[in-house]
Amino acid sequence: MEVDSLGGSKYLLLIVDEGSGCMKGFSLRAKYDSEECIKKYIMAVQTQFDYKVKFVRHDGAREFAANPLKAFYDDLGIEQQVTVPYAHKTNGTAERAIRTIVTIGRSMLHYAKLDRCFWAEAAMTAIYIKNRLPSPKCQDQTPFEIVNGFRPSVKHMRVFGCRTFVLTPKERRSKWDPKAREGLFTGYEEVSKAYRVYDIEAD
């Protein structure tokens, strides 16, 4: 990316499940961080969802073809497919997904009038939204639905960059302190089912 994210990340790793179209994103400070992220993703898929990862397709970049990753794939019986250099069509699923996420994320940043350093938050939110949109390739089911077996709720979804107020716990404020702090909505936490908020007052 042209600028570092708020958390100091420089790269976006996007993993796309060929079967469902479900995406998983990671913001990375260095390219070699992708190794642990890929391992973490594969182990989560195989243990939490009881799915067998059969193959991994990538463009042959050094960080994706490292020996530790090759050994990891071999141990799990995962086939490694390397696409043809400079032939983007051979990795069309990933190329289209990246283009889609960047387009959505860029639009959200523009609409919210936020600096480009919020790109990681915008990208993760775009992925979260895309996973919950019906896909014509999957009989109008959402990728989330295909993976989890039930329809996702969208009642909790908010406009990226909108103004928010976060309640400050009584234990962390005095009688005369404001009850809430102002912030900007910057996404969702999938594990804890919470919102991500940028604290304006901390600047």
Question: Which ranges hold each PLM region?
Answer:
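Anionic group-binding determinants
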Residues: 1-203
